[in-house]
């Protein structure tokens, strides 16, 4: 039992600060980054303290901040209002922050690009994925996967409930499961552009258009979209796009969990 002791890799200064479960993940954030600060710990609490003390010694705005994903950052807004609260200059899109890079970064526990002052350990990152076997065909079966980390008991692998066994519904439900099984600041990484855009770019427009698409058709999967939106309404949540079926370890694990759920 002693040989499987869990390690925590704290990155107090790097491309994306946070606490990582493997060295491969952490090293991507510090290799080639001038003035990096990182250390391995046997406990989450010690890694957390390192991030707080070492991270506070440096300006959060110094040095490059690069990531390969597209990040959609949420700040809390009132669920009773049809309008999203603002973060940037536009009425709606200031709730959405995007950052791009050609450099590949993988699974992270990071601060949102607009909230780097938050202690790195206060935000967790999970991967969510959905899978539908025979998607769009008769007899399709779908599953949802949420990956928290290697051997993490919180990892989720379940079949998709309901009659509609589509990939899009599985992707949305996976995000819902990630939200329902966490608390506090959260980053969800997904390879579903549909899910991310539904909850960010498109939802404000749909609300103004009586939940109709640009072609005046009813919005599909609105039950899941509204559920996810409600769960995000009182939390600081970021949705980050990662390329599916690539070398991203976290996405691979979430996909495996989703496929397993579809096979149950």
Curated annotation (Swiss-Prot):
Organism: Schizosaccharomyces pombe (strain 972 / ATCC 24843) (Fission yeast)
InterPro entries from the UniProt entry: Ribosomal_bL9/RNase_H1_N (IPR009027), RNase_H (IPR050092), RNase_H1_euk (IPR017067), RNase_H1_N (IPR011320), RNase_H1_N_sf (IPR037056), RNaseH-like_sf (IPR012337), RNaseH_domain (IPR002156), RNaseH_sf (IPR036397)
Region (Disordered) location: 55-88
Gene Ontology cellular component annotations, sorted alphabetically: chromatin; nucleolus; nucleus
The keyword Aminoacyl-tRNA synthetase belongs to this UniProt entry's keyword annotation: no
Name of the protein in question: Ribonuclease H
Enzyme class: hydrolase
Positions with a binding annotation for Mg(2+) 1: 129, 171, 191
Required cofactor(s): Mg(2+)
């Amino acid at each position: 039992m002693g040989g499987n002791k869990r390690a925590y890799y704290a990155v107090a200064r790097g491309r994306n600060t946070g606490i990582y479960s493997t060295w491969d993940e952490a090293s991507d954030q510090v290799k080639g980054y001038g003035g990096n600060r990182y250390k391995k710990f046997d406990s989450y609490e010690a890694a957390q303290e390192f991030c707080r003390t070492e991270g506070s010694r440096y300006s959060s705005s110094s040095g490059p901040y690069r990531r390969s994903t597209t990040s959609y950052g949420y700040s809390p807004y009132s669920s009773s209002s049809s309008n999203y609260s603002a973060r940037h200059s536009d009425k709606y899109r200031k709730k959405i922050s995007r950052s791009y890079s050609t450099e590949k970064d993988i699974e992270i526990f990071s601060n949102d690009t607009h909230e780097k002052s938050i202690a790195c350990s206060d935000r967790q990152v999970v991967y969510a994925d959905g899978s539908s076997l025979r998607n769009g065909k008769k007899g399709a079966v779908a599953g949802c996967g949420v990956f928290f980390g290697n051997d993490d008991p919180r990892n989720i692998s379940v079949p998709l409930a309901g009659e509609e066994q589509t990939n899009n519904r599985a992707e949305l439900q996976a995000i819902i499961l990630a939200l329902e099984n966490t608390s506090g600041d959260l980053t969800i990484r997904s390879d579903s552009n549909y899910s991310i855009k539904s909850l960010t770019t498109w939802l404000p427009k749909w609300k103004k258009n009586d939940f109709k698409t640009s072609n005046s058709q009813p919005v599909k999967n609105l039950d899941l979209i509204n559920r996810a939106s409600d769960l995000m309404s009182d939390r600081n949540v970021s949705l980050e796009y990662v390329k599916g079926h690539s070398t991203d370890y976290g996405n691979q694990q979430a996909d495996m969990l989703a496929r397993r759920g579809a096979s149950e």
